[in-house]
Curated annotation (Swiss-Prot):
Its EC number is 1.4.4.2. It comes from the Bacteria. The glycine cleavage system is composed of four proteins: P, T, L and H. In this organism, the P 'protein' is a heterodimer of two subunits. Keywords: Oxidoreductase. It comes from Listeria welshimeri serovar 6b (strain ATCC 35897 / DSM 20650 / CCUG 15529 / CIP 8149 / NCTC 11857 / SLCC 5334 / V8). HAMAP family: GcvPA. It catalyses: N(6)-[(R)-lipoyl]-L-lysyl-[glycine-cleavage complex H protein] + glycine + H(+) = N(6)-[(R)-S(8)-aminomethyldihydrolipoyl]-L-lysyl-[glycine-cleavage complex H protein] + CO2. The gene is gcvPA. The glycine cleavage system catalyzes the degradation of glycine. The P protein binds the alpha-amino group of glycine through its pyridoxal phosphate cofactor; CO(2) is released and the remaining methylamine moiety is then transferred to the lipoamide cofactor of the H protein. This is Probable glycine dehydrogenase (decarboxylating) subunit 1.
Length: 448
């Protein structure tokens, strides 16, 4: 009979397994752990609860969280509060789709493969690039993989990255680069954008590529046309990290001549979820097609002439040639990519443009409201849905007081750069109403 309620193994099973591996007891398996640090007391667990009692307790705990269903959120910095069409959860909950894994058997996975193909197609169209892959883990790892591709393609070992790129993405790149012995140099930002003079001085024949964010971490729209000319004159690659929603209004990076465009599709159908899991995307020009990391789904025809979808160019991947793979990305974000596909398809081209326009209009209204009320708003150039406001108190204190008023405040820029202490990065999406924006500005009146 089994010793444990939830483990079907009997004492005889246990004895036979221990005999096979040559140990006498379960304790022998942990002999490498010093005796003095082993946990030997009984677990101080509370008595078991019934399911309804447990649900009540967990609901009570969950209610302590500040959530965007009950609070007006002005927090962005890479993760945003956007409307998720109700059909998204319905579709991704279907058993045929409910997996984060890539389908290796096309004969029984046509639905999922087509959904991934649609994701690739929509991302390629939004970014203005020739093709996109099936997804990456998130925007930060997509950016790092783009830099690795640039280094491998150009056979150069140095990457330049704008200081106006999200600092967390920049840190992910530095982590990747360490293992590959690639040097990363940060080009400072000035007035919320890349310092062009510093970039010109840093360019040399050992530069594989330059990474820029569009719109950038401070919400500003970088001059991609000018950057493209500079970078390509140096025979380096232009790598652009972009918010895909902004591309409903902004000129796509591909039209400026970007070589690689990456980002995170969290803005389409994926909840904030305390920072993840989300869904990175990776789009390139045709010349880089065979060096793309991750899965690629292609359209073909079977022996009867019927349309079909398959994983293509698989020789690039680690499950085929691990030591020579373009990347070691494995199980990807297929389920979240599906969520983004459903959200984009539901919005359609007109709806996506309208959603982007609402972000633009509402954020510009908020910025104007701050200025009218005497706040110092940094940077005067164009932006999409984020801007920077200077306050008189530490942002952490301000945000704690805002929670009492049902408001989730903006991002504390001083967290990564002391130059921006007491500066708040404010994000305004289509979810915010005029009344909420007005209340937010009024709540900050005492700290301007």
């Amino acid at each position: 009979m089994a010793k444990h309620r939830y483990l079907p193994m009997t004492e005889q099973d246990e004895k036979e397994m221990l005999d096979v591996i040559g140990v006498k007891s379960i304790d022998d398996l942990f002999q490498d752990i010093p005796e003095k640090i082993r946990f030997k007391r009984d677990y101080d667990l509370k008595p078991a609860k019934s399911e309804p009692a447990l649900l009540r307790e967990l609901s009570k705990l969950a209610s302590k969280n500040a959530n965007t269903a009950e609070y007006a959120s002005f927090l962005g910095a890479g993760v945003y509060s956007h409307y998720i069409p109700t059909v998204v959860d319905h579709v991704i909950s279907r058993s045929e789709f409910y997996t984060a894994y890539t389908p290796y058997q096309p004969e029984i996975s046509q639905g999922e493969l087509q959904a991934i193909f649609e994701f690739q197609t929509m991302i390629a169209e939004l970014t203005g690039m020739d093709l996109a892959n099936s997804s990456m883990y998130d925007g930060g790892t997509a950016l790092a993989e783009a830099a690795m591709l640039a280094s491998g393609h150009t056979k150069r070992k140095k990457i330049l990255i704008s200081g106006a790129v999200h600092p967390e993405s920049s840190n992910v790149l530095k982590t990747y680069a360490t293992g590959q012995h690639i040097e990363v140099e940060v080009i400072p930002e000035i007035d919320g954008k890349t310092d062009m003079d510093a970039l010109k001085k840093a360019l040399s024949e050992d530069i594989a590529g330059f990474v820029v964010q569009y719109p950038n971490f401070y919400g500003q729209v970088e001059p991609l046309a000018e950057l493209e000319k500079l970078i390509h004159e140096n025979n380096s690659l232009l790598l652009v990290s972009s918010n895909p929603l902004s591309l409903g209004l902004l000129t796509p990076p591909g039209e400026f001549g970007a070589d690689i465009v990456v980002g995170d599709s969290q803005v389409f159908g994926i909840p904030e979820s305390f920072g993840g899991p989300h869904c990175g995307f990776f789009a390139v020009t045709n010349k880089l097609m065979r060096k793309v990391p991750g899965r690629l789904v292609g359209e073909t025809v079977d022996e009867n002439g019927k349309r079909g979808y398959v994983l293509t160019l698989q020789a690039r991947e680690q499950h085929i040639r691990r030591d020579k793979a373009t990347s070691n990305i494995c199980s990807n974000q297929a389920l979240n990519a599906l969520a983004s596909s459903v959200a984009m398809a539901t919005l359609g081209k007109t709806g996506l443009i309208e959603m982007a326009k609402q972000n633009l209009d509402k954020s510009h209204y908020a910025k104007q409201k701050f200025r009218e009320n005497g706040f110092e708003v940094l940077f005067s150039d164009g932006f999409f849905n984020e801007f920077v406001v200077k306050l008189s108190k530490p942002i952490k204190e301000v945000n704690e007081s805002l929670l009492d008023e049902g408001i989730i405040g903006g991002y504390d820029l001083g967290f990564y750069d002391t130059k921006y202490e007491k500066h708040m990065l404010v994000a305004v999406t289509e979810m915010r109403t005029k009344e909420e924006i007005d209340a937010f500005v009024a709540s900050l009146e005492g700290v301007k």
